[in-house]
Structure formats: structure tokens, C-alpha cells
Amino acid sequence: AYKGVRLKSVLTLDKKGLAAMTASVSGAICAAFGKYDVVHFHAEGPCAMLWLPKLFGKRCIATVHGLDHQRAKWGKLASTYIMMGEKCAVKCADEIIVLSKGVQDYFKETYGRETKFIPNGVNRPVIRKPELIKEKFGLEKDDYILFLGRLVPEKGIAYLIEAFKKVNTDKKLVIAGGSSDTDEFASQLKEMAKDDDRIIFTGFVQGQLLDELYGNAYIYSLPSDLEGMPLSLLEAMSYGNCCLVSDIDECASVVEDKAIVFKKSDVADLQSKLQEACDDVEQVQKYKDEAADYICEKYNWDDVVKRTLELYRA
């Protein structure tokens, strides 16, 4: 085990919409009755059970990765439950960690609740040659634009497909990732893309395939309407990618002036920025040259761990 860390399995129902909820209920019960000093909840939904270990005298920390009740994939009942988790965290948590300044402002303005800003971190990766991706998808270095993430509406993938279809380029668009209780939406995306053979859906990727996709892209795009702290954006920059992101604060505050930014939800602006990037290799290379050093220094995992442990011990 890494520094004494052990994994403990809990009971859960592997059913759509119930897996996370039942896991958090089981985990909270185990934490309440176990010999633990600190219980750390992640995401708003699981925080609905934070009161239980708190009732048993545990120090409780909540990390809010994003405002999950705003995500389009959730119905009214699920959104209500997630909102209950948010309010439980506000009322019961000893400390709340947020991953973006936007979410920090939300908690201050909505509840008057102070939070601690501790973003995600990233490590510098090993860059792999395009071997598996060439074999499976016919991809070469710098001949594709990459989106990598869950296929959910708020990620803006529909904008990206619509914009890319109007771009004059031989480069491909690779949509990498699986659905997240959103199979119908994933099918809609594939229907949108079916008349453009430049668009490739890889499905869920991990390991060497993931590394090769990150390490050989011409551009990485994250056109989201809503984010918490986009770890995929940190990872993409750590691989030395030129990134093209929407101007929401959660993306813009990460990239600062080290990436290309377009107006959120604006397909025409996204198309224009894509076309400019495809036509201007020197501009793209400039962003590539700066990305990895910038992001690995700004978001260092050792610093993240140190600050989190300080909250545990407070």
C-alpha cells in the first residue's frame, strides 16, 4: 500500500443512477462506525450522507468538484438529491474544498460559506509514439483534433462536431470517451457526425491508448458549458498540447494566456478558431512549446497533497 493507504470495498447497486448514491451510503455507514479520524467526501451527491459520520464525531471534509445539480444529464429527482448533498456539506462539513474560483464564489454568495481553494494537480507524463492509435484508428502525430471526456451535454461536444464539420481541413476529429448514464446523447452525437468520415469515436480509452491520444494530438479541445476543475485539460497541457477551450472561468482561469479561447456555446466562433489553428501551424506550435512547463508548475500534485493533509490535521 502507498504510505499505508488501503482500499476498502463497500456494498453498492450497479444500476443506472444508483451506483454512486448506494456507494456513498455504504461508505458513510462504514466511516461512521469505523476507527477513522477524518472522513473525506467527494462530489455533492455523496455529501448527502456527510451528516452521519459527523454525528459520530468524525472530522468531515467535503470536496466539491463542480456544481453537479446543474448538469443536464440529471433529472429532477437526482438534481434534488444532489442539491441536498450540497446543503448538507454547507451545514455539516468541517471544511469544504473547491477546485475553482467560480465555485468558491458560488458558495460565498449563496450560503455565506467560506471554502478552501485546492485545485487538482498534474504530473509530467512520458510521451509515447503513435503506435496503438495508428493500428486501431489510423491516426498519426498532429493529424487530429482531440476531445477526451465523458459524452455528456454540458461538455459542448455537439458544438465541436457542428463547428468542425464546417472547417476546411484534412485533419480528423477524435471524440474519445464513454457515456455517463447518457447513452441516448452519445447516439445523438454519432448521428450528427455520420456524414463526415473525418470524425472518429473511440469509446472509453485508458492506459497506452489514452497516453498516445494525448501525446500526438494537433489540438486538444474542451468546449464545455459547465465544468468543475477540468482534470483532462490539465492532463492535455501536461502532454504539451495546444488547447482550444470555452471562455468559462473554470477553463479560462486554468489556461490564462497559454491556450486558444472561444466564446462559450458560440459555434461560429469555435469554427473560426478551429480554422485559424488548422491554418496557422506556427501559432499552434507556440502554444505547444509553452503548455507543459506552465501547467506542471502551476498545478503541482505535491502541493495539492500538502495542503489537503493540512486540512486533515487542523
Name every feature range the model reports, one short phrase each.
Residues 29-32, 55, 79-96:
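Membrane-proximal helix-turn-helix segments that form the acceptor-binding/catalytic region
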Residues 41-46:
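Short His-centered aromatic/hydrophobic patch
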Residues 143, 147, 152-166, 187:
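A conserved mid-protein helix/loop that constitutes part of the nucleotide-sugar donor-binding site
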Residues 186-205:
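Nucleotide-activated donor-binding/catalytic signature segment of Leloir-type glycosyltransferases, i.e.
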Residues 204-205, 212-217:
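Short alpha-helical donor nucleotide-sugar binding micro-motif in glycosyltransferases
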Residues 225:
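Aromatic "clamp/platform" in nucleotide-sugar-dependent glycosyltransferases that forms part
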Residues 242-245:
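Short hydrophobic beta-strand element within catalytic cores of glycosyltransferases
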Residues 260-268, 276-282:
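Conserved acidic donor-binding segment of nucleotide-sugar-dependent glycosyltransferases
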